[in-house]
Amino acid sequence: DIEAQRVLRKDIAECARTLPKCVNQPDDPLARVDVWHCAMSKRGVYDNPDPAVVKEKNSKMCPKIITDPADVENCKKVVSRCVDRETQRPRSNRQKAINITGCILRAGVVEATVLAREK
């Protein structure tokens, strides 16, 4: 989805520009949990804290930013696993969202995205 990729690219750039970068964070904005959390929040992924809704909205992003069907399926599985794991513990909705985002990034989903291939 070219339009979704364009908007997400813009959101990532804006989030990377406006969020303070800590010394220990990677230079690449695509490797930063705070940048992805910010960009996904702008897309409304975390508006409703219900785990089923978060899972559905995150999963819907997979085919928008990944072109290989096998990678899309892997993305959806990772999203499901991360949402299930990170919503078990009592935390604020914001912290759960950040943890879900981090879990997805650590699983290597970003490397399969169109955005990562453009570098």
Swiss-Prot record:
GO terms for cellular component: extracellular region. Homodimer; disulfide-linked. Keywords: Allergen, Disulfide bond, Secreted. Signal peptide: none annotated. Belongs to the ant venom allergen 2/4 family. This is Venom allergen 2. It is found in: Secreted. The keyword Secreted applies. Gene3D superfamilies: 1.10.238.190. CDD domains: Sol_i_2. It comes from Solenopsis richteri (Black imported fire ant). Expressed by the venom gland. Its main location: secreted.
